[in-house]
């Protein structure tokens, strides 16, 4: 039985939770206790959705500006992009349009995108008093439509909320995209 490999790349501002999301998902829901900054990392995770096995090759990228020359090196052959912002960091949300979509259009136009709002557990946190600047779900949904994302979802790595659903959607979208684009492969002889 052939196992399909899906290349997933995560991008977004520094500190939005890319590494934590991937570590939690690939470690069976175990939230990491220490923060480890990432320049570039690759997680491999086997998933079974609707009886079909897939090997997820998930690339974690650094969000800092000083890595803008490194990120494009991993874009070739990407099947789907996870574009992350943190709901408590409005600047990371605004950077989706001002920074990230520009980079995507330059290096991998037409790639399927899932827009992901992270850290939704903070909406219910008693530790944060002023939540007036938090990004609301409807704002994320509107932005996903504006940028032409295939899907929008929110999740919490700390509470392991929405991660399984996110990666089920990744597999479904890549399967649909491959079925619709079987004849669009470029072959150079």
From Swiss-Prot:
GO terms for cellular component: cell projection; cytoplasmic vesicle; cytoskeleton; plasma membrane. CDD domains: Rho. A lipid is attached at residue 186 (S-geranylgeranyl cysteine). The modification Cysteine methyl ester is found at residue 186. GTP binds at residues 12-19, 60-64, 118-121. Pfam families: Ras. It is a lipid-anchor. Keywords: Cell membrane, GTP-binding, Lipoprotein, Membrane, Methylation, Nucleotide-binding, Prenylation. One of its GO terms (biological process) is establishment or maintenance of cell polarity. Its main location: membrane. Residues 187-189 form a propeptide. InterPro entries: P-loop_NTPase, Small_GTP-bd, Small_GTPase, Small_GTPase_Rho. GO terms for molecular function: GTP binding; GTPase activity; protein kinase binding. It is found in: Cell membrane. Gene3D superfamilies: P-loop containing nucleotide triphosphate hydrolases. Belongs to the small GTPase superfamily. Rho family. This is Rho-related protein racM. It comes from Dictyostelium discoideum.
């Amino acid at each position: 039985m052939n196992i399909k490999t899906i290349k997933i790349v995560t991008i977004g501002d520094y500190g939005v939770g890319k590494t934590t999301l991937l570590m939690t998902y690939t470690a069976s829901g175990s939230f990491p206790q220490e923060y480890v900054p990432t320049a570039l990392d690759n997680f491999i995770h086997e998933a079974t959705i609707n009886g079909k096995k897939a090997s997820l090759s998930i690339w974690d990228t650094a969000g800092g500006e000083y890595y803008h020359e490194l990120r494009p090196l991993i874009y070739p052959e990407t099947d789907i992009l996870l574009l992350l912002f943190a709901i408590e960091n409005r600047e990371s949300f605004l950077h989706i349009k001002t920074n990230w979509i520009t980079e995507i259009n330059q290096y991998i136009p037409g790639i399927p995108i899932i827009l992901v709002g992270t850290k939704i557990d903070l909406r219910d946190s008693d530790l944060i008093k002023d939540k007036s600047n938090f990004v609301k779900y409807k704002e994320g949904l509107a932005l996903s439509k504006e940028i032409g994302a295939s899907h929008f979802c929110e999740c919490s790595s700390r509470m392991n909320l929405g991660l399984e659903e996110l990666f089920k959607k990744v597999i479904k979208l890549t399967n649909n995209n491959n079925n619709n684009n079987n004849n669009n492969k470029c072959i150079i002889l």
